[in-house]
Amino acid sequence: MKKLALSLSLVLAFSSATAAFAAIPQKIRIGTDPTYAPFESKNAQGELVGFDIDLAKELCKRINTQCTFVENPLDALIPSLKAKKIDAIMSSLSITEKRQQEIAFTDKLYAADSRLVVAKNSDIQPTVASLKGKRVGVLQGTTQETFGNEHWAPKGIEIVSYQGQDNIYSDLTAGRIDAAFQDEVAASEGFLKQPVGKDYKFGGPAVKDEKLFGVGTGMGLRKEDNELREALNKAFAEMRADGTYEKLAKKYFDFDVYGG
């Protein structure tokens, strides 16, 4: 009798594990906007590189799923996910209340503040008084765009939206905008520490608004894909525990990008 009960328990456990595994797609299409170094961009050979790309590849390997990347502008990623043109978003996507009304997120992958980048000889600060009459570049579909349109645009500050972060920096260096407003880490590693950004700096402190900027970034998923989300969260927790996350992060950052 005990042997029969044990056999039944093993069968049930195996069936549950098999069902959970079957619920995870064998192939996943991951949407990304490759204009946001060091998280996602293209190298000289046209290959996708960056911290998000490395994280996604490792997560896919751990859940035994074949992943392909689909390039899209940031503001097209959530509509593409909901329309089932892609299965996940890995593109430095902030976990915000507004976005959580539309999609689900994995656990936090890393954190970053939002800051202005200005010329070194500029005294621009992230205040209405300092920015009034100025032109501020933002990436379409970002929390920075939302903040700018809600808090700055009504007070005489021109918010200029772009489809690629590289275009923002090009216009900043050409003098067509007065400041760029983006993720602090992306600005530091992808622009300020590069030769093209040598004449630029952060303009003032970080802009804080937890409701708009969220509590960190995560992988975006459809709300109904619970098994996939749970599998990714489990894999990510294992990466944090076994040192893989830290190893990948050190390729790009000289500080704790995960945050508190």
Curated annotation (Swiss-Prot):
What family name appears in the similarity comment? Belongs to the bacterial solute-binding protein 3 family.
Q: Is Signal among this UniProt entry's keywords?
A: yes
Origin organism of this chain?
Answer: Salmonella typhimurium (strain LT2 / SGSC1412 / ATCC 700720)
Give the UniProt subcellular location, in the record's own words: Periplasm
**Encoding gene (name):** hisJ
- Stretches that traverse the bilayer: none
Q: What is the lineage of its organism?
A: Bacteria, Pseudomonadati, Pseudomonadota, Gammaproteobacteria, Enterobacterales
Q: Where does L-histidine bind?
A: S91, S92, S94, R99, T143, D183
This protein's GO CC annotations: outer membrane-bounded periplasmic space
Quaternary assembly: The complex is composed of two ATP-binding proteins (HisP), two transmembrane proteins (HisM and HisQ) and a solute-binding protein (HisJ).
Q: Which PROSITE patterns match?
A: SBP_BACTERIAL_3
- Recorded protein name is Histidine-binding periplasmic protein
